[in-house]
Structures are given as C-alpha cells and as structure tokens.
UniProtKB/Swiss-Prot annotation:
Shikimate binds at S20, W21, S22, T68, N93, D108, Y236. The keyword Signal does not apply. Belongs to the shikimate dehydrogenase family. Transmembrane segments: none annotated. The active site is at K72 (proton acceptor). It is an enzyme of class 1 (oxidoreductase). This is Shikimate dehydrogenase (NADP(+)). Pathway: Metabolic intermediate biosynthesis; chorismate biosynthesis; chorismate from D-erythrose 4-phosphate and phosphoenolpyruvate: step 4/7. PANTHER family: BIFUNCTIONAL 3-DEHYDROQUINATE DEHYDRATASE_SHIKIMATE DEHYDROGENASE, CHLOROPLASTIC, SHIKIMATE DEHYDROGENASE. Involved in the biosynthesis of the chorismate, which leads to the biosynthesis of aromatic amino acids. Catalyzes the reversible NADPH linked reduction of 3-dehydroshikimate (DHSA) to yield shikimate (SA). GO terms for molecular function: NADP binding; shikimate 3-dehydrogenase (NADP+) activity. Keywords: Amino-acid biosynthesis, Aromatic amino acid biosynthesis, NADP, Oxidoreductase. It catalyses: shikimate + NADP(+) = 3-dehydroshikimate + NADPH + H(+).
Length: 295
C-alpha cells in the first residue's frame, strides 16, 4: 500500500467552498505533528446529494468531515448520533466516522467561546448583542448561554420573521430579544446596544470582496462603540475588518474572526485525532496566506 493510500482522509462538505482556509489549517496541523492524514474539499452541488455523499463516505472509510453552509442542518438526519451541543441548535459542523457510525458535533459553540473565556467574569449577568440571524448567530447565542450566563441576548436582524423561525425550536428562547436593524436609529434601541458588554457581528458584512459596509448594519453617529465593550467580528478575511478598526479607535477590546476560525478547527482536530492543533503555527500560516492572497 502506498503512503497516500494509508492516510486517513478528512474533508470539508460545502457548496462553492474552494476558497476555504480549512485545508490549510488542518493539513498544517497534520504535517506539524507527523500524522498520516490529509484534508481536502468535497463540493456538493445540492442538498439532495448529501444523503448519498454520507452513505458513500461510510463505504469509502472517510475518517471525518467539517461541514459548512448551507449544509450544517441538512446533514443532521443522516447521522447516527449528535453531541449535546449539536442537538441544542440542530446544526453540525464536524462529523466523525466511528467504524461506520457517523457522529455529529458542533465546534462553532466552543470555537466562538474560546477567545472570550479570559473575559468571562466581565460578561456574566451583562447584556450582549449579536448582529445576524443565521447559524453563526445561533451558535453565538448558545455559546453565551452555556459559557457566560449573560443577563440577556439582543439579536439585531434585517428579517425579524426569519429570526423568529430560527429560534422557534430553541429551548432557551426567553433569553433572546429580537430587534429589526432599522430600529437602531431609535433612542431606546441605541441605548440597549450601547449598554451591551459584547457586540458580535455574525453576518458576512465586511468580508473582503463584498460591496456592503458595516455601517449598513451598525450606523455611525449613535456612539454605539465605546471603551467598555468587547467587539467580536466573526469575519476573518480581512483580519482587521472595518468594524474592528472602528471599535479599536473607540477604545473597545476587539476579537478578530480568525480566532474563532482556528478555535473551532482546533476542537474538530482534537475530536478527530486526540491531539492538539498547533494553534500558533496555524495562525501564523493562515495570516501569511491571507496577506499573500490580498497582495
């Protein structure tokens, strides 16, 4: 058997995910630790093909997957068991093939929480605010509930009905209040946001190559950013987003999206291999690759 044939195969399930940094992250870790593993990309064109893809993975002995949008919920019915975190929000981003049984995990929750943990005491019993109503926002809601015990979670969204639908089966719905983004101009809503200990951007606004701007969801002129806040942007490319630049200028503590990207990958890496991802090396490698891609 050749060396390539003896390697465990891991991969990313998604749609149009050739841009992903996940192969670089995991292959850097595998190589650094001398593990006989390789990570690749599995572009799946439609949700109707997910069941066949996972069935085939059992037969082929693929060791595990990462799962990204739009399939984090789609994969759930085809798995044999879910972790408590995955069950709580009905979404999976990590799969392990355990001798033909497919086990689903959600590492977005711990990945989101990781860079906030050193500031946990300052978050407890304080309100927090999340912009967005997709899976990333729900993972952030659950991370706050499980790890930080905030007094409340303010969800600021463009589509309030979509947010209501997302939270319909969430067991801790009473923790969350929903506001439409257009309400930010109203003094009462502005005050709620200013009083939040943490502000999170869980939308793709600010991502390199997009035409929109953070001011489309967080208008200026309301003093919403200040030095008593932690501002967390899940966008990781560019590493310093417009939101983070404005928050830094306002004196806020900032957390870049690359920290969540690497932390959730590190948790998946540990689930798959039982070893710790060399986080410092991976961060340096990914930042260098992002800088090169921008050049």
């Amino acid at each position: 058997m050749s060396n390539s044939q003896s390697k465990k195969i891991f991969g990313l399930i998604g749609k149009h995910v050739d841009y992903s940094w996940s192969p670089l992250i995991h292959n850097t870790g595998f190589e650094a630790l001398g593990l006989p593993c390789v990570y690749t990309i599995f572009n799946i064109p439609s949700p109707e093909m997910i069941g066949d893809a996972l069935k085939g993975s059992r037969a082929l002995g693929i060791a595990g997957f990462s799962v990204t949008i739009p399939y984090k919920k789609t994969v759930v019915p085809f798995l044999d068991e879910l972790s408590p975190e995955a069950l709580s929000i009905g979404a999976v981003n990590t799969i392990v093939n355990d001798n033909g049984r497919l086990l689903g995990y959600n590492t977005d929750i711990d990945g989101f929480a990781a860079p906030l943990l050193p500031m946990a005491e300052s978050i407890r019993n304080r309100p927090v605010c999340i912009f967005g109503n997709g899976g990333a926002a729900l993972a952030a809601v659950e991370a706050f509930r499980l790890r930080f015990n905030p007094s409340s979670v303010l969800l600021v969204v463009r589509d309030t009905q979509k947010a209501e639908d997302m939270l319909e089966e969430y067991a801790y719905r009473d923790l969350v209040t929903i506001h439409a983004g257009r309400e930010i101009d109203q003094p009462a809503c502005s005050k709620l946001i200013r009083d939040c200990r943490v502000l999170v951007n869980a939308t793709p606004v600010g991502t390199a190559g997009r035409n929109d701007h953070i001011h489309s969801i967080l208008p200026t002129g309301h003093g919403l950013l200040h030095d008593g806040q932690i501002v967390y942007d899940m966008v990781y490319n560019p590493p310093e987003t417009p939101l983070l630049a404005e928050a830094r200028a306002a004196g806020a503590t900032v957390i870049a999206g690359i920290e969540m990207l690497i932390a959730q990958a590190a948790r998946a890496f540990s689930i798959w291999t039982g070893q710790e991802l060399p986080v410092d090396l991976v961060r340096k490698t990914v930042l260098a690759a992002i800088e090169k891609s921008e050049g």
